[in-house]
Amino acid sequence: MAEATEPKEVSSGSQGQPEGAVIEGPGEPGAADLEGREASEGAAEAPRDLGEGAEAMASGKEEGGCGQDGEIGEVQAQDPRPGPGTETPGTSGAPGEAEAAECDSEGALIPQSGGGAKRQQVQGTSSGLDAQGEAPEVPEDARREPEDPKASEAGEEAESGQEALGGSAPESQINPEVQGPVGDNMDTEAPAGEPQGSEGEPQGGGESSPQPQDEAIEIAAAEVGGHEPGELAGASAADAKGEGETLRKDGFEEAAPEEARVDSGENGFEEAAPEEARVDSGENRDQGRLQEETGEEEARPESGLKGPCEEAIQEKAPDGSLDGEEAKSTGHEESQVELSNHLAEETSAQGGEELGRVNGRRENGPASEEGDLGQEHDITLFVKAGSDGESIGNCPFSQRLFMILWLKGVIFNVTTVDLKRKPADLQNLAPGTNPPFMTFDGEVKTDVNKIEEFLEEKLVPPRYPKLGTQHPESNSAGNDVFAKFSAFIKNTKKDANDIYEKNLLRALKKLDSYLNSPLPDEIDAYSTEDVTVSQRKFLDGDELTLADCNLLPKLHIIKIVAKKYRGFEFPSEMTGIWRYLNNAYARDEFTNTCPADQEIEHAYSDAAKRMK
């Protein structure tokens, strides 16, 4: 890249330092003469007589630094000082017009293209007055139509000559997602109130027409990215004029449906900071032909989906909005462009849906994943301690809740409580309450039946399995067995023992009959074989349910204590009960929550008195 050279000539306009750039369209008065001047100063190969045919054209009035008819214009900079790293047309080897200038009263994005064009941030302010205090006015017809038709042909020949010298003109477009290598990125910034020279424009000897400040203040925010890349990449003056923008009657610029606009404030001014506006002009340097308008509009949202900064935008913008320009980093500075409502409205429907899907995955990805897995709860179960004060003691109600939490698959803590030395903090936690009780996210729950209902309602699918029964009869099966056992084991009279034993056997037989009776879903209506004996593992089927968590701990106690103190065992002909117990002993949810046999025997040592 050639070094920047100091301009040899100063602006022939007002001597004051203007604050804005003047833009003249290729078809406007003075355009051909301006091209001639640039060609003579920038490239020796360009013919000098190209602009002579349009010398009689009058310079057009510009509002806010932008052509009223919306044409792509040439930019004349007032600041003769080149920005750092900026190329001058004389040394770059590819002089050309500074195209697609977009101006704003406070902050402006000016896409520029030409030979060796780089990314550049341009800050512009309101234009100054000319020597007479106001800009010369020319009728609109004179601005829109060239007086000499040869001027357009001369401009096209000049452009073709310049393209031959500088290669294919790079496309210039607003691309908020893609940022080129460091070598291709040039950010020229100036303090507020000072102008900057636009890249690719002559640094001296050019004509300029300062603008009245009153007119500049009335101009609304100029559009950003309003022109297609083809218009900014060496399109002919006639094509650029045909695709130009129209102005509203009040001076506001209307954007085409496929063009994105920058959201302006109440006064119509863009409120983005100078360093927040970025212009991408040169990413597609090898692209030599124009792209279709619809294709370009569809490509813009897709670039956001594949951009390298997609993850950085999402971290910084939790709301997941990718509809505006994303933040850019320059050196140690980071800035973010304010989102535009107009930009969101102008985004194509397909692109918007894709962005929405990306936002949903990226911003809410970890959150959605966590939501799918379910919220972790702080659960502590307090159970009765054994005789040693530490191990799990004999308590069918404690084991019932222990099994439910285990089957739910929830993370929980188990604390054994020694009733002989109950800590003061536990007495304050649940005063007057013996285990089992539970704390769920800091809330104390003491009623076993209500705890069971609460856990079934709180810990639900898809993460936590449903433990309720499908057949209501399963909930009441064996509900009288434990009461019959208690009466049997506490009886001390030998003559009454047979009566209590028969009552217990009657209750066990009823339970065995239910376990051997096939459930409705075990019977196949289309099968020729009749199912007379059930083969299910548990009360309600092949999976453990809340009914099993209630009955199995009691059956296990009956089996241990009755044999130890009364020599009573479940009859072998009760195949349903034995199948039920054997399947339960094969499950960790049951065996790992059972107290030791010695603990069970020790608990009934006093209750099971010898018969007299």
Swiss-Prot record:
Motif G-site mapped to chain:
395-398
**Listed Low complexity bias regions:** 84-96, 208-223
**Which region ranges are annotated with the description Disordered?**
1-373
Q: Which residues carry this modification: Phosphoserine?
A: S40, S264, S303, S321, S368
Pfam families linked? CLIC-like_N, GST_C_2
- This one is known as Chloride intracellular channel protein 6
Q: Which organism is it from?
A: Rattus norvegicus (Rat)
Q: What is its EC number?
A: 1.8.-.-
